[in-house]
Amino acid sequence: MMKNLILSACLAVAAVAAECAVACTGMYAGRKVSEDGTVLLGRTVDTAPWTSSHMYVVEPRHENEPGRVFRSWKNDFRWNLPATTWKFVSTPRLRSIGGGRMDSACVNEKGVAITGTVTGRTNEKAQKADPFVRGSGTGEESLPGLLAACCATARECVDLLGRVIAEKGHTGPEIYMFGDRDEAWYVEVYTGHEWAAVRMPEDKVACWGNQFMIRSFDPSSPDTLCSPGLVSMPEKAGFLVKGADGLPDLYRTYAPELTDYSNYRTWFGHRTFAPETAGEYATDRPMELFYVPSHKVGYREMFELMRTRYEGTDRNPEENGLPGVRTIGTTKQATSHVLSIDASLPERFRCTLWASLGNCEHTVFLPMNAAITACDEAYATDQTEGEFRYDARIASMAFRRLAALAEKDRRWYGRGVRDFWHAREDTYLAEYPGLLKTLDAAKLTEWTLAAQRKDLADARRIFDDLAWYITANNRIEGDGSGATNEPPAPFKP
């Protein structure tokens, strides 16, 4: 009886967390400033640990099957699907978690990459003027998968997003990114029906926390798209703000005041990519969305930025006794990803999804190409809605438990785990480009399945080894023994 009560309470917490604890960090590098000439779209998916359970799945193509309807897991949102929908690889949340599917990151057979969302913040005036449509609207819980199934270009993603929001409304303040061979788009959704999109420059980079970033916005520019009421709605309601150039300032119109929670991440990303233009940090200083980096940006740098806890600075929580500091490398990461778009490849091979499960500080980024036909069963296993439970056979839970143990003591436990996965990623970064050049979907699938199985086996083994290391070295606090000895050496897998 008590066990059931505890489980019910935990599930209730999980349900609340699924609704309100989503808070991510986004990143971007244009093809002219990335190390390998690809477009890079990155994002951490940050939520409560109880909901840190995602899958890797391959959704099949459906050919000439009219009459199908896309249904949200979260609310009453419905959308009629075209007769043919595209195959795509994605990282959805387990159905048992509740709160919607949240495909999170998708790459499809048409060479389109989609990530969503980074949660933004909308001010009270905007929310009152155009409330979010939570009962039947679309949002991060449904839109990424719908777009991946229906869209053959990034521009089609923006257009369909606009049509869906106009007809159904949106559930919350969110930021999306879409990319293809020719262009990439950054989209901010401010209210139930108002949104703006800007074409992302090929020669710049970006990093931002949970805040809207678009300042001066010209609706007539060929590099922008927006909802019909983006400017007229706030103008009529009396809260439109214009900049010195006479154009709408979307941040000042739709967003509340800046906070350290989000703005420090934005500044730290700028300092990482372009230290000479980052300037000194100030809570109330808006940062530029796009800027020229001081160097070429690659996968490794994005991976490590997603892991950072501001080591070596006065804001590192562990070094400075500041447990409340919001780092980019938070323990609440459910999954993280970097999507790459290689314009030189045929469309079905063009996009690769590099993803990790659990807190990426102590797990591994693995590449999955859009052309693969399967993921290992442990990565693709779902749970029935409303029946969320711990099951270490599910890959995300195996990785999450390892990360949870490693982060209890980053000096003695975590460093060795992090170094192990770092070496594994180096192997993938060296091997994968050559494999991709074969343009062989069967070989890519075989390689991916083998890599997934090896990573999972190692995660389970390292967890067992680390648990024994902790036990053998008497590092479990509060055991009553009074032992104070330090281990002879940090844990090494």
Residue ranges and their predicted role:
Residues 144-150:
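Short, well-ordered beta-strand elements within core beta-sheets of diverse protein domains
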Residues 1-9:
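Bacterial N-terminal signal peptides that target proteins for export
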Residues 24-140, 160-289:
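A contiguous strand-loop segment
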Residues 156-166, 302-306:
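Short, well-structured alpha-helical segments that form the helix of a local strand-helix-strand
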Residues 317-441:
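Substrate-recognition/cap regions that form aromatic- and gly/pro-loop-enriched pockets
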Residues 416-493:
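Histidine-centered catalytic/metal-binding microenvironments
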Residues 16-23:
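Sec/Tat signal peptide C-region and signal peptidase I cleavage site
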Residues 266-322, 326-331, 416-418, 424-435:
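Accessory, solvent-exposed terminal regions and/or long lumenal/extracellular loops of proteins
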